[in-house]
Amino acid sequence: MACYIYQLPSWVLDDLCRNMDALSEWDWMEFASYVITDLTQLRKIKSMERVQGVSITRELLWWWGMRQATVQQLVDLLCRLELYRAAQIILNWKPAPEIRCPIPAFPDSVKPEKPLAASVRKAEDEQEEGQPVRMATFPGPGSSPARAHQPAFLQPPEEDAPHSLRSDLPTSSDSKDFSTSIPKQEKLLSLAGDSLFWSEADVVQATDDFNQNRKISQGTFADVYRGHRHGKPFVFKKLRETACSSPGSIERFFQAELQICLRCCHPNVLPVLGFCAARQFHSFIYPYMANGSLQDRLQGQGGSDPLPWPQRVSICSGLLCAVEYLHGLEIIHSNVKSSNVLLDQNLTPKLAHPMAHLCPVNKRSKYTMMKTHLLRTSAAYLPEDFIRVGQLTKRVDIFSCGIVLAEVLTGIPAMDNNRSPVYLKDLLLSDIPSSTASLCSRKTGVENVMAKEICQKYLEKGAGRLPEDCAEALATAACLCLRRRNTSLQEVCGSVAAVEERLRGRETLLPWSGLSEGTGSSSNTPEETDDVDNSSLDASSSMSVAPWAGAATPLLPTENGEGRLRVIVGREADSSSEACVGLEPPQDVTETSWQIEINEAKRKLMENILLYKEEKVDSIELFGP
C-alpha cells in the first residue's frame, strides 16, 4: 500500500483507533515509541486523553501522517509488534475509485417507518448494483397555472411526495392510506395563499434579471439578490457552479436544500417562501431580513449601533433553539456561523440553512468531503476533529454555536487574517489551562476557569454593562460548546435562557444547569468542616449571584435600614423584590448570612459523580490518572 496514512478512509481510521486505544498502556507506549522518539512530544499527546478526552491513537497517527508516513509502514510496524488484529483492519480495506452519482429518488415501495437517510442509502446501493434510479421530485402546493410552467421533474402526482416530508404518518395497519397524508409544513404554506413555485419570468421580473445593482452578497455556492413582487421585498438566492464543484452539483444542492426547507417550521429558522428551477438558473426565495446578519451587526457594518446585551443574549437563545430544533428532526446544519444568523425588523434571529444535511444512519455515510479552499472560509467555526477526520455529527453544530456565542460575548470576529492567531477558536482554546494547571479543574471546572479568563481579557465593552455573573455564565456556555465532546444543547439553552431572564430584570427560578461555580444538586447536603472556601460563600459578594443561587441554595430575605426587603429568592418573594434586586445596601447595615457552609471538596465530588452517571465526564477525570 503506497498511499499515506492521512489518506486512510475515516471509517477505517475509526476502527483502528478504537482497537489501539483499548490496548494496555504498556503495549500502546511500545507502539508509540517506535513512531515518536521525542518523549516530550509523546507525553504531550498522551496527556490529551486526560485533559481533552480525545483519541490518543488518532493524535499519534495524525502527527505521523503529517510527516509523510505511509500505510505500509504502519502495517509493518503493527505486524512487528504482533498487533495483528489492528493490522487486519487496514488490510481488509482496499482503495476504491470515487463514484459520483446524482441524488436518487425515493421509490414508492419505501416503507413509511424507515428513516429518510436509510431510504437514500438503499437507493444508492441499488444504483451501485446497476439498477436504474429515478430523479427525486418535489411537489409544490401552488395553483395549477403555476404548475404549467414547472419542469417535468417537478410535476409528480401528490401521492409521489417524498416520504420524508410526511409528518402525520399513521402507525396502525387500519389507518388511512399513506398517500393522502399531507405534511404540516405544506399545509401551513398552502394556507398562506401563495404558491411555492415561482416561474422563471416572475423571478427575472422581481430581480430585474439579477441586476448587479440588486446584489446583496456573494457566497461560495450562491449569489444573493434583493427583489420586489407586489410591493413586497424578497431575497433571491441564485445557486451557481463553483470552480471545484462536480457536474450536476447545482441540481443536487437545490433538491437537498428544498427537501430540508420543507421539513423545517420554527420561528428561529429562516422559512422558504418559494423556489424556481429554471433552465438558466436555480433560485430560492426567502423573506427580506431588514437588519442583515448577526455578523454585520456585531462588526458595526453600515454604521449601525452596537447591539445591547439583552438583545445579544436573546439572539443567542434563538440560535440555540433553532439548532436544537434541527437536531430533533435529525438534521445537521453543518454551517452555523454569525453570517448565517439573519435578523428581521424586530431583531429576531433566523438561522439560514445553506448546507444542512440529514443525519446518517450507517458508518460510511457519516463522513463528508470538502475542498480545501472552501473549507478555509468555514474552518473558523469547525472543530479540529471534523477538519482532520471529516466525520459529520451534531457535535459540529454545537461547536459552531460556541464560536457564535464567543463572537457575541467578545465582539471579536471569528476569522481575521491580520490577527495572530487568525481564528477566534484558537485564541480562546489557548486559554484552556495547561495539564499542570488543570489539576485544580476537579474542584473548580476547566470551563469555569476558562470562562473567567475570557471575561477578564476579551469581554465586549461597547455594548454596555453586563453583570459579572451573567458574563461568566455566557462564557461558560460557550466553553462547554467548544470543549466538551458530548455537550447537551438543552443544558446550554437553559443557561442562556437564565441569563436572558436576568437581563430582562425579572426574578427567575430557572436552574443554572450546574454551570456556575457554587451550585449543584448536592449543595443542600450539610457538611461541617474546617477546610471550607469561605470566599465563595461570602455574604458581601453574594449580591451578583443571588438570583442564580436560588435554584440550589435559597437565600433568606434580609432587611436594610428602612425595613424593606433587599434580596428575596424563593416562594416568599413578592412584587417589591423585583424592584429592589441589585440595589446596594447602606454602608451602615450589618449583613447576616444563615447559609449552611458546604464542604467544597465533597460537594464537587458529588457533582462529578452525578456528571459521571450522565456520561458527561469519564472516570479518569473523576478519580484522576
Swiss-Prot record:
ATP binds at I216, S217, Q218, G219, T220, F221, A222, D223, V224, K237, K337, S338, S339, N340. Residues 210-489 form the Protein kinase domain. It holds the Pfam family Pkinase. GO terms for molecular function: ATP binding; molecular adaptor activity; protein heterodimerization activity; protein homodimerization activity; protein kinase activity; signaling adaptor activity. InterPro entries: DEATH-like_dom_sf, Death_dom, Death_IRAK2, Kinase-like_dom_sf, Prot_kinase_dom. Residues 169-181, 516-526 have a biased composition (Polar residues). The keyword Nucleotide-binding applies. PROSITE patterns: PROTEIN_KINASE_DOM. Keywords: ATP-binding, Nucleotide-binding, Phosphoprotein. Residues 13-94 form the Death domain. Expressed in spleen, thymus, prostate, lung, liver, skeletal muscle, kidney, pancreas and peripheral blood leukocytes. The modification Phosphoserine is found at S144. Residues 111-181, 510-540 are annotated as: Disordered. Interacts with MYD88. IL-1 stimulation leads to the formation of a signaling complex which dissociates from the IL-1 receptor following the binding of PELI1. Belongs to the protein kinase superfamily. TKL Ser/Thr protein kinase family. Pelle subfamily. Binds to the IL-1 type I receptor following IL-1 engagement, triggering intracellular signaling cascades leading to transcriptional up-regulation and mRNA stabilization. The protein kinase domain is predicted to be catalytically inactive. This is Interleukin-1 receptor-associated kinase-like 2. It comes from Homo sapiens. The lineage of its organism: Eukaryota, Metazoa, Chordata, Craniata, Vertebrata. The gene is IRAK2.
